[in-house]
Amino acid sequence: MSASPAIFLCEPFTKSCGELQPEPCGLIIFGASGDLTRRKLLPALWRLYQRRRLPARFYILGCARSAYTPEEFRLSLQKALPLDSTVNEAEITAFFKHIDYLSGDYSSLVFYEELKEKLKHLDEYHQLKGNHLFYLATPPNLTEDIVSGLGSCGLAAQHTSSLPLRWSRLIVEKPFGTS
């Protein structure tokens, strides 16, 4: 049996550990219409959701160049879920209420302004403080455009003391290079 995906905090001298509940946040996946999201990311997030390992308040925003509506995107992802006989329709519906989609050109500053507005709306709707985890499931040649775009509209900037609890994180999935 594999280890639980929970986050643990261990005291260095007492060796006692306790599980931490992740902070409420928005997970923004660039390259969301791709194979990595369908085969790996979404099934992993689904399993975390089923095991109550995601924050109580969260959302997943898929971003990609593919021109899907949010409904079309959710439908395409639903086909990728690892479902078994214990899963009920209400649980699937509840999970997909946390998923939205935004299409656009990663090299366009207009896209990042739209993203900023979308995140503001989703943060308000899900009652979040503006914590964002940006996940780049994209080819390496798109990394610079995405990071520059996030920085240009203030989404990846270090936050000021006026919002001390707000954070942004960036995960780059793809290795750099061509081989």
Where would I find each of the regions flagged by the language model?
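Extended hydrophobic secondary-structure segments that form protein cores and membrane-embedded regions
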Residues: 27-31, 59-66, 98-104, 132-137, ...
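A structured beta-alpha segment of the ubiquitous adenosine-cofactor-binding alpha/beta core
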Residues: 82-130, 151-156
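Glycine-rich, phosphate-binding/catalytic loops in enzymes
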Residues: 45-47, 78-79, 151-153
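N-terminal low-complexity, Ser/Thr- and acidic-residue-enriched intrinsically disordered segments
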Residues: 1-72, 116-117, 132
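Beta-strand-loop-alpha-helix segment that lines the small-molecule cofactor/substrate pocket
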Residues: 133, 151-179
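Glycine-rich phosphate-binding loop and adjoining beta1-alpha1-beta2 segment
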Residues: 50-103
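Phosphate/oxyanion-binding active-site loops and adjacent basic polyanion-contact surfaces
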Residues: 5, 37-41, 69, 73-79, ...
